[in-house]
Amino acid sequence: MEAAADRPAETRSRVEKDSRRAKKDSPAKTQSPAQDTSIMLRSNADTGKVLALPEHKKKRKGYLPAESVKILRDWMYKHRFRAYPSEAEKRMLSKKTNLSLSQISNWFINARRRILPDMLQRRGNDPTVGHKTGKDAHATHLQSTDASVPAKSGPRGSDNVQSLPLRSSPKGQMSGEKIPEPGSAPSQKLTMIAQPKKKVKVSNITSSSSPEPVSTEEYADFSSFQLLVDAAVQRAAELELEKNQESNP
């Protein structure tokens, strides 16, 4: 009887132990598929982020197509002295580059600050050709500005001819007038004493505050000049006689 009573107790204890074990094992078994699926979802999400990262960077940087940028750079180089397009030119560039007007405006705003200074120092029609030196670029800029300004020329008056200094006149020049020295005071007078086949003496008659007279030596042939002076004096005397005869018949 006692052995029969012990057997149900042992079976009960075994059943309880098995049930406890089943309870302990069942959560682990049920959680393992959920954990596996969560890990897979996380890994898929991470790979999706990695794959989507380059596209996101491209969108954020806003790179334009290389062909469109080349068209815009060529236009800027041709109009580098007026490097911002008008509305009509923007529409024309938009058709060529397949870009919007806002993209073209933003590109020119940035390019005028970053690309244009280097572009102004380039040489030739191709902006990729080598740089100029600073003096060459400055000389080219001056030539372009001088070409747009018309040259001013006109006949010089007799005053400008008379104001030339004596040392710059040619040897064969003949003049009986007094030639003022450039830069001299108004009170100074320049007199010239001419003799045939002799030295030319130039003396300044100045005021007390002016410097001492300066003499310059210049060899010249004034024989023909002397003949003209004599002829002019003779002609003047003849005219004076004719006037006197007419006044006193």
UniProtKB/Swiss-Prot annotation:
UniProt key word Transcription: yes
DNA-binding region: 55-118
Membrane-crossing residue ranges in chain numbering: none
One biological process term in Gene Ontology: regulation of DNA-templated transcription
Compartment list: Nucleus
The keyword GTP-binding belongs to this UniProt entry's keyword annotation: no
GO terms under cellular component: nucleus
Bias (Low complexity): 202-215
Residue ranges of the region described as Disordered: 1-60, 121-215
Physiological role: May have a transcription role in testis.
Family note: Belongs to the TALE/TGIF homeobox family.
PANTHER family recorded: HOMEOBOX PROTEIN TRANSCRIPTION FACTORS
Protein name: Homeobox protein TGIF2LX
Organism: Miopithecus talapoin (Angolan talapoin)
Gene: TGIF2LX
